A protein has these predicted regions:
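Short loop/turn segments that flank or connect secondary-structure elements
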Residues: 1-188
Length: 188
């Protein structure tokens, strides 16, 4: 572990390599899992506010689940998450050419909304656990991301470098620069 400000960071963020390979994994992170994407209360509010603008990008099954249950639910561990379709894929997942993508991100890229996607999705495979006095930043290694680990290894791109944009979105440019300073100390 290494500390940057009040963030405790797993060494795997520096040691492991990662670059998403959608052609290999087919966007499985939007489909596989026991619960939806973790959300903050602010993100749930944002999703409710932009839902009508995202809706044209969504698949019917996702729309139907949101109409029944809303954009977010509490999972079995009591965490706020995006609602699922058939207890499997995120309601915002869409399939294009056999690859699962995010309808929120598609709406963002088209300029329909100003919200890219939930930060937990943007940061994946980093998972952040917020405590009262610090954030724990960990790397979640899962089987479906094996192609991303292989691709990152070939390109020699560590997790923290691949996720530069979402880390800056979450913690700011100044914090990310301090993280880069820490990598120099670590020899990464």
């Amino acid at each position: 572990m290494i500390q940057v400000e009040d963030k405790i960071i797993s060494m795997n963020i520096f040691k492991k390599y990662f670059v998403c390979d959608l052609n290999a994994c087919k966007g499985a992170c939007c489909v596989e899992g026991d619960s939806g994407a973790p959300l903050t209360a602010e993100e749930e509010k944002k999703l409710n506010n932009i839902y009508e603008k995202v809706k044209p990008y969504m698949e019917e099954e996702g729309i139907s689940e949101i109409e029944k249950h809303g954009v977010a639910v509490y999972d079995s561990e009591g965490d706020l998450t995006t609602t699922l379709v058939n207890n499997r894929e995120c309601v915002f997942a869409i399939e294009k050419e056999e690859i699962s993508l995010c309808s929120i991100e598609k709406a963002y890229l088209d300029g329909a909304i100003d919200f890219k996607k939930p930060i937990s999705c943007h940061l994946f495979p980093i998972r952040v656990k917020e405590y009262r006095d610090f954030d724990a930043i960990n790397y979640e290694e899962i089987k479906i991301c094996k192609p991303a680990c292989e691709c990152g290894g070939k390109l020699e791109v560590p997790v923290y470098a691949f996720l530069k944009e979402p880390l800056i979105r979450k913690y700011g440019e100044d914090w990310y620069q301090k993280l880069l300073e820490a990598t120099k100390v670590l020899g990464k």
